[in-house]
Amino acid sequence: MRIALGVQYDGAAFCGWQAQPHGKTVQDALERALGEFACVPLHTTVAGRTDTGVHGLGQVVHFDTDLDRTDFSWVRGTNAFLPSTVSVQWAKPMPETFHARFAAFERTYYYVLYVHPVRSPMLAGRAGWIHTPLDDDAMRAAAAHLIGEHDFSSFRSSECQSKTPVKHLYQIDVRRSGHFIHFRFRANAFLHHMVRNLMGCLVAVGRGRYPADWLADVLAGRDRTLAAPTFMADGLYLAHVGYPAEFAVPPAQLGSVPWSSVWADLDLPS
């Protein structure tokens, strides 16, 4: 039997998603909890591996098991063995054709940026921060150059294991709410560090360091050294993974973050 889980986690508490020998990753914590509840080792496959500091609101995993449990039993039983920084939100039996990674056709990330002369300790690990004003319109104009199917080598980490740098970026939204700017990135898939590298470039344009059309030149150059430095991970959230309707994957529970009302206005896909 194949079981899918919806998982949320505080990325600041972990060294990324992927299991490591030191055991301080989200995958390590989840698989330990599943093993405790099931009394047998269980291996998970994830929709998208997030880096250290990146949060998960709509992360999806699957695993195979012969155990017969109710859906909510998997939720409550696994959560009983998880730290407070990770939570299984739902569980659902799936057909063998479902695959958390390969069945997904799109991913959506949000970035929350706090723009204020002084950093807030209440937002540590929850939002990025910059002390200088930003030009929202300039960032929107720059983002427009990135929409479509392109070779995103200029925004790819040297450690990226993707077979191709070509991805289809469907949408970038920039929405201001008080001292916060909310960015939404939606694509069929993302390269390693791609969103954070895009953020670094958008912020550089917003600060007036480059004109909006500079980003078109960076994209065309297909050279990582042309782009701005990788932006901090603190405000990055994996919010949604899209699957074909036949799998009826439950929607991510975004109400757990204080800025969910702003995100709702951005019309998160279901």
UniProtKB/Swiss-Prot annotation:
UniProt KW tRNA processing keyword: yes
Catalytic residue positions: D51
EC number(s) recorded for this UniProt protein: 5.4.99.12
Catalysed reaction equations from the record: uridine(38/39/40) in tRNA = pseudouridine(38/39/40) in tRNA
Domain of life: Bacteria
Keyword Isomerase on entry: yes
Binding site for substrate: Y109
Record keywords, A-Z: Isomerase, tRNA processing
Protein name from the UniProt record: tRNA pseudouridine synthase A
Subunit record text: Homodimer.
Any one Pfam family match given in the protein's UniProt record, by short name: PseudoU_synth_1
Organism encoding this protein: Burkholderia ambifaria (strain ATCC BAA-244 / DSM 16087 / CCUG 44356 / LMG 19182 / AMMD) (Burkholderia cepacia (strain AMMD))
Task of the protein: Formation of pseudouridine at positions 38, 39 and 40 in the anticodon stem and loop of transfer RNAs.
GO molecular function, one term: tRNA pseudouridine(38-40) synthase activity
Family membership: Belongs to the tRNA pseudouridine synthase TruA family.
GO biological process, one term: tRNA pseudouridine synthesis
Taxon lineage: Bacteria, Pseudomonadati, Pseudomonadota, Betaproteobacteria, Burkholderiales
